UniProtKB/Swiss-Prot annotation:
Intervals, Cytoplasmic compartment: 1-20
Disulfide bonds: 421-460, 759-766
Transmembrane parts of this sequence: 21-40
Gene that produces this protein: ERAP2
Protein name as it appears in the record: Endoplasmic reticulum aminopeptidase 2
Binding site for substrate: 200, 334-338
Membrane topology, from the record: Single-pass type II membrane protein
Summary of the tissues where the protein is detected: Ubiquitously expressed. Highly expressed in spleen and leukocytes.
Protein source organism: Homo sapiens
Length: 960
């Protein structure tokens, strides 16, 4: 799954930007695998005290008390029939589940949520063979655990197969989960309906009763009944279509490969497609609503290239004969990797050359790469439980880097990947962060696992490990992992084992070391000679939260190293700092270079302190080469002064990514109280001469964030001086920008960012040019093609007049491009009129003109503006109950609404307001980890201002 708001730029600044066989032995495998994959809990007894068991909806004792299902009944195969009615907006369905019993039991527990089960029967394998009718089963329901119990008349016999049949029905959902309805508007203004599924993590149970846990893999044979004006899609290719009385059609699909329930998918719609074939013969089709089929060309081209790449890289063929990618008009995540039928937000799949920018193209490519990687990581090999979702999400995020670099090098995603790591450091440097692997039991807890820690940090530690082991060894290890656990489930240790043993016999040196390099220290060579230590090292990154700080002190040719836990908002002088440092120790694969040589040196820091000897005297040393390591570096003594001097004298002696890393680390260290703000600001002087777009964008992002912080707090003297400094020092590079779509991807993204900043700061030439283009666009009735990279800027300037704002809202409703709609919606959110902002929020809640899927990002964008911050916060408090009717408590949307409307606060009054609101929610039984994250973030903001405001004021007075 790809989670990201369609309107939140992934450069840590909230903006509207688009930025998510093998059938042999199947009869034998289930019996072989039961012992290794499933075990009966030791506490599993049927004679427990009745008082210990929950009560079903009919008042009877429910025979199971755990959130996790018992493993005494294993599903092998589902026959599923579904008939959705897109007029009455409901569906009827039936299923027959083949199960294998491992222990005697008188009940079968499975998941079901909001389904009306009208009939349930049980047949033994022998009864089925002789066509004997099934025996009626009593159904008990326990909604608190989303479980049902099927009570059997006599105990089921171990090692025998049975068939459970059920008839059921339900309404198509109004939200974004289970089997739900979506709508779209045609070019002619007609509203049409489709029915679509989204099951991850625990919503398959809303569409059919099932064993809805990733460990319960099975095969699925699906039949869908529909009207002739619609098509039906599912995971597998269609085998045949049967014509029924009354004009209905019934599509039968091939039986799936063995897979988890959350990957099942089916859709009934009237979409059109564009298709092509990979070099290995897989048919790839891109589906979209009929009027948007012309926006599917790029997605098809990218999908074909990426699928070919993955088959070669993983040395495993994609196991299905087709792969469909479909753009869903109403879809909560960025995308979902259902095997063979990947569902996307329109903004994550469709590309319109007239309205999609360079960053839009990068976004679409990334999300396609992410979901296609899941066809191996997640689908072919699945985590045993949701506590380890990083095994699929971290890998898919990491494979974006590998795959996009290989297939579209011109997109220069290698440079962009730094942001993936920088984004998560913001959260991981708070005490409220969590380990990558963390227990999660309830549906809400499971949903909360879909966050930056699983995705971004997971990807970053994999990239660090790849850099450490070497690309070839790392690739061999993951191929071994995928082949060993195909169609099975895996856990962390299985991955480390595969990566530890990825050295082939021919790879070893005479000394028994799998990788040899003269720049490695002796402890690095020793480590690589002891492959088992991969697990020992990596568990320090997956089982403890946070990020390490490497403190470096140079003394002649000697380097003294010390590691600490890096914490934002908690300073060394604070009483709690020392306690928060205890028991934290990482095995850090260090890299460093010096002013004397381009050689990259390597060393593993496994202790709190260590000493390194340099081969020669050097004026500076730079750790974390290319920012491949997941750690912050602080240079004590004159270390920072020497690096800043080098940047000012000749910044090109430091590698481009190292310059980005230095800018990032220096400002992060200010937030941790380890450096004064003036030291970090002094570093920005050199940016006048910087030609690398990533470094320029990194520096500008911090300066711009300070400006917005002052603007929201109405600290006008500082905000005006910051504006003056930005326009004074960056005017040459701003004035060099053309209002066009020319240049490399990074040239274009820099242009968008610089011109947006200039117009935000009311730079007269920028405002004048944007207003001129907007007037021409209005006069052309929206037909003028404005360069896509400046489209959002032009719309934002135009939205500042009532006539412009109203016209944009009209165009938003008429537009057939989701990319353009995102840019318009961002522009509308920049209005300084609160009644207009409130209208946008109301339209988002209603969900017709502005789809509810965009509400979280809309609130986030409005809250960042001085005129919108209180409005958005008040709206959330007053409409919390209504918001929970639209989004699940643990959903990404709810978490984004909470953080997006509160995390920018920086006063004690606001901290108290937010704290009281969270306490009131917890009193009602609603608890989320994001509550503590937000409170810590606001506290961090308060402390940042207290510590740095006088310095910022003084520095600006001297430098403007």
């Amino acid at each position: 799954m790809f989670h990201s708001s369609a309107m939140v730029n992934s450069h840590r600044k909230p903006m509207f930007n688009i930025h998510r066989g093998f059938y042999c032995l199947t009869a034998i495998l289930p019996q072989i695998c039961i012992c290794s994959q499933f075990s009966v809990p030791s506490s599993y007894h049927f004679t427990e005290d009745p008082g210990a068991f929950p009560v079903a909806t009919n008042g009877e004792r429910f025979p199971w008390q755990e959130l996790r299902l018992p493993s005494v009944v294993i599903p092998l195969h589902y026959d599923l029939f579904v008939h959705p009615n897109l007029t009455s907006l409901d569906f009827v369905a039936s299923e027959k589940i083949e199960v294998l019993v491992s222990n005697a039991t008188q009940f079968i527990i499975l998941h079901s949520k909001d389904l009306e089960i009208t009939n349930a029967t049980l047949q033994s394998e022998e009864d089925s063979r002789y066509m004997k009718p099934g025996k009626e089963l009593k159904v008990l329901s326990y909604p608190a655990h989303e479980q049902i119990a099927l009570l059997v008349p006599e105990k089921l016999t171990p090692h025998l197969k049975y068939y459970v049949a059920m008839d059921f029905q339900a309404k198509l959902g109004d939200g974004f989960e289970g089997f739900y309805k979506s709508t779209y508007r045609t070019l002619g203004g007609e509203t049409r309906i489709l029915a679509v599924t989204d099951f991850e993590p625990t919503q398959a149970r809303m569409a059919f009763p099932c064993f809805d846990e990733p460990l319960f893999k099975a095969n699925f044979s699906i039949k869908i009944r529909r009207e002739s004006r619609h098509i039906a899609l599912s995971n597998m290719p269609k085998v045949k279509t049967i014509e029924l009385e009354g004009g209905l059609l019934e599509d039968h699909f091939e039986t799936t490969v063995k897979m988890s329930t959350y990957l099942v998918a089916y859709i009934v719609c009237d979409f059109h497609s564009l298709s092509g074939f990979t070099s290995s013969g897989v048919k790839v089709s891109i589906y979209a609503s009929p009027d948007k089929r012309n926006q599917t060309h790029y997605a098809l081209q990218a999908s074909l290239k990426l699928l070919d790449f993955y088959e070669k890289y993983f040395d495993i063929y994609y196991p299905l004969s087709k792969l469909d990618l479909i753009a869903i008009p109403d879809f909560a995540p960025g995308a979902m990797e259902n095997w063979g039928l990947i569902t996307y937000r329109e903004t994550s799949l469709l590309f319109d050359p007239k309205t999609s920018s360079a960053s839009d193209k990068l976004w679409v490519t990334r999300v396609i790469a992410h979901e296609l990687a899941h066809q191996w990581f997640g689908n072919l090999v699945t985590m045993e439980w949701w506590n380890d979702i990083w095994l699929k999400e971290g890998f898919a995020k990491y494979m974006e880097l590998i795959a996009v670099n290989a297939t579209y090098p011109e997109l220069q995603f290698d440079d962009y990947f730094l942001n993936v790591c920088f984004e998560v450091i913001t959260k991981d440097s708070l005490n409220s962060s969590r380990p990558i692997s963390k227990p999660a039991e309830t549906p809400t807890q499971i949903q909360e696992m879909f966050d930056e820690v699983s995705y971004n940090k997971g990807a970053c530690i994999l990239n660090m490990l790849k850099d450490f082991l070497g690309e070839e060894k790392f690739q061999k290890g993951i191929i071994q992992y995928l082949k060993k656990f195909s169609y099975r489930n895996a856990k962390n240790d299985d991955l480390w084992s595969s990566l530890s043993n990825s050295c082939l016999e021919s790879d070893f040196t005479s000394g028994g070391v799998c990788h040899s390099d003269p720049k490695m220290t002796s402890n690095m060579l020793a480590f690589l000679g002891e492959n088992a230590e991969v697990k020992e090292m990596m568990t320090t990154w997956t089982l403890q939260k946070g990020i390490p700080l490497l403190v470096v002190k140079q003394d002649g040719c000697s380097l003294r190293l010390q590691q600490e836990r890096f914490l934002q908002g908690v300073f060394q002088e604070d009483p709690e700092w020392r306690a928060l440092q205890e028991r934290y120790l990482w095995h850090i694969p260090l890299t460093y270079s010096t002013s004397s040589s381009n050689v990259i040196h390597r060393h593993i820091l496994k202790s709190k302190t260590d000493t390194l000897d340099l081969p020669e005297k050097t004026s500076w040393v730079k750790f974390n080469v290319d920012s491949n390591g997941y750690y912050i570096v602080h240079y004590e003594g004159h270390g920072w002064d020497q690096l800043i001097t080098q940047l000012n004298q000749n910044h090109t002696l430091l590698r481009p990514k190292d310059r980005v890393g230095l800018i990032h680390d220096v400002f992060q260290l200010v937030g941790a109280g380890r450096l004064t703000l003036d030291k970090a600001l002094d570093m920005t002087y050199y940016l006048q001469h910087e030609t690398s777009s990533p470094a320029l964008l990194e520096g500008l992002s911090y300066l711009e964030s300070f400006y917005h912080m002052m603007d929201r707090r109405n600290i006008s003297d500082i905000s005006e001086n910051l504006k003056r400094y930005l326009l004074q020092y960056f005017k040459p590079v701003i004035d060099r920008q053309s209002w066009s779509d020319k240049g490399s991807v990074w040239d274009r993204m820099l242009r968008s960012a610089l011109l947006k900043l200039a117009c935000d700061l009311n730079h007269a030439p920028c405002i004048q040019k944007a207003a001129e283009l907007f007037s021409q666009w209005m006069e052309s009735s929206g037909k003028l093609n404005i360069p896509t990279d400046v489209l959002k800027i032009v719309y934002s300037v135009g939205a500042q007049t009532t006539a412009g704002w109203n016209y944009l809202l009209e165009q938003y409703e008429l537009s057939m491009s989701s990319a353009e709609q995102n840019k318009i919606l961002y522009a509308l959110s920049t209005s300084k009129h609160q009644e207009k902002l409130l209208k946008l929020i109301e339209l988002g809640m209603e969900g017709k003109v502005i789809k509810t899927q965009n509400l979280a990002a809309l609130l986030h964008a409005i809250a960042r503006r001085p005129k919108g911050q209180q409005l958005a916060w008040d709206f959330v408090r007053e409409n919390w109950t209504h918001l929970l009717k639209k989004f699940d408590l643990g959903s990404y949307d709810i978490r984004m609404i909470i953080s997006g409307t509160t995390a920018h606060f920086s006063s004690k009054d606001k901290l108290q307001e937010v704290k009281l609101f969270f306490e009131s929610l917890e009193a009602q039984g609603s608890h989320l980890d994001i509550f503590q994250t937000v409170l810590e973030t606001i506290t961090k903001n308060i402390k940042w201002l207290e510590k740095n405001l006088p310095t910022l004021r003084t520095w600006l007075m001297v430098n403007t």
